[in-house]
Design a protein with these regions (language model features):
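Extracellular/periplasmic catalytic domains that process cell-envelope and extracellular macromolecules
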Residues: 9-11, 72-76, 99-102, 124-128, ...
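Segments of small-molecule ligand-sensing domains
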Residues: 152-164, 175-237
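Extracytoplasmic ligand-binding site segments that recognize negatively charged/polar headgroups
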Residues: 20-31, 117-118, 165-171
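Conserved C-terminal helix/tail region of periplasmic/extracytoplasmic solute-binding proteins
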Residues: 193-197, 228-262
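Extracellular/periplasmic Venus flytrap/periplasmic-binding protein
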Residues: 1-98, 140-143
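Cofactor-binding loop segments of dinucleotide-utilizing enzymes, especially the Rossmann-like FAD-
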Residues: 20, 110-112, 227
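Buried hydrophobic packing segments
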Residues: 3, 7, 170-178
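Extracellular/periplasmic periplasmic-binding protein-like sensory domains
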Residues: 93-168, 182, 249-260
C-alpha cells in the first residue's frame, strides 16, 4: 500500500500506470490498483510495455492523450504517472520531455526506480524535473545499521540499503541456526529460523517473520532525484511511509514545497 498512500498524500486523484510486462511489475500493479480503488482513486489507463523495449514513443503518446484529456477534470497537480520498471526508465524519461503533459505531471515509482544509477547518471535533468518519487523499504535507524552503512560506503561508494542489510541479517540467522543445530540440513534449519529471526535485531531492524516465512512489513523511504550545483544528478530522501500508521511524511525542506491535498 505504500505507493498508493504516497500518491494520495501528494494530492493525486487520478493516474496513468506505465509498467514492464512481467510478473514482477504485474504484482506491484495489482496491489497498487486494488489499494488505489479502495480509497476512491481513479486509474485513467494501464500501459504495459515489453521488458526489452527501448523505444517508448507510442506508450508515451498514449499516456499524453489520456493525461491531457484529464487536466480539465482534475487539474494538472492532481494527476500523475506511476511507472513500474527498472533501468529502462532512464531512456523513457529522456523521451518523455517531448510530451508536454507527460513531462509536466509528477511521476511516482517503486523500488525498481529508487537509487537507480542509470536514471541518476543518464537522465538527471528529466528525473529531477518529474521528481520520480519512488518507495524503497527502509532499515530501522540504529547504531548497527549506521556503522555498517559507513563501512560499506567507504568500500564501494554506494548506499547500504535495506535489501543489502537484509542479506547481511540472513547470513547471521543462517549461521546461528547452523551452530545451534550443528547441521546444514535445510529442513532442520527451517524449523529454527522463526525463533532465531524473532529474537534477532539486525542491521535492517527486527527480523521477525510472518506465517508465510516472509519478513514483516517495513517502513518505506521515498527516494527522488535532483540536480547538484555541478549539473550532475543525486539521490535524496523526500519522505517516509510509516507502515504502522499508514501515514506519509513529506520532507518539505528537501523537496522545496508542500504537496497539494486531495
Amino acid at each position: 500500500p505504500a505507493i498508493a498512500r504516497m500518491m494520495e498524500s501528494h494530492g493525486i486523484e487520478a493516474y496513468v500506470s506505465i509498467q514492464r510486462g512481467d510478473s514482477w511489475a504485474d504484482g506491484i500493479y495489482n496491489i497498487l490498483s486494488e489499494e488505489w480503488a479502495n480509497n476512491g482513486g481513479v486509474e485513467l489507463e494501464r500501459i504495459r510495455y515489453a521488458a526489452e523495449v527501448q523505444e517508448f514513443s507510442s506508450y508515451l503518446q498514449q499516456a499524453e492523450n489520456v493525461l491531457s484529456a484529464a487536466v480539465d477534470e482534475y487539474g494538472i497537480e492532481h494527476i500523475a504517472i506511476d511507472v513500474i520498471g527498472f533501468q529502462e526508465v532512464a531512456t523513457m524519461l529522456q523521451q518523455a520531455q517531448d510530451y508536454p503533459t507527460v513531462y509536466e505531471v509528477v511521476w511516482f515509482g517503486s523500488d525498481g526506480t529508487a537509487l537507480t544509477s542509470q536514471i541518476r547518471d543518464d537522465a538527471p535533468d528529466q528525473a529531477s524535473h518529474v521528481n520520480l518519487y519512488s518507495t524503497l523499504a527502509a532499515p530501522a535507524e540504529s547504531q548497527k545499521y549506521t556503522d555498517l552503512y559507513d563501512r560499506y560506503w567507504s568500500l564501494v561508494g554506494m548506499p547500504y540499503g535495506y535489501y543489502t542489510a537484509c542479506t547481511y541479517d540472513i547470513g547471521w540467522i543462517l549461521a546461528e541456526t547452523i551452530l545451534e543445530s550443528q547441521s546444514t540440513d535445510a529442513l532442520t534449519l527451517l524449523d529454527l529460523q522463526y525463533t532465531t529471526a524473532f529474537n534477532s535485531f539486525g542491521a535492517s531492524g527486527w527480523n521477525r517473520l510472518n506465517e508465510d516465512g516472509d519478513r514483516y512489513a517495513a517502513n518505506y523511504q521515498i527516494w527522488a532525484y535532483r540536480l547538484k550545483p555541478d549539473g550532475t544528478g543525486e539521490d535524496y530522501i523526500a519522505g517516509l511511509y510509516d507502515f504502522v500508521t499508514g501515514q506519509v511524511t513529506w520532507y518539505t525542506q528537501e523537496i522545496g514545497y508542500t504537496p497539494p491535498t486531495r
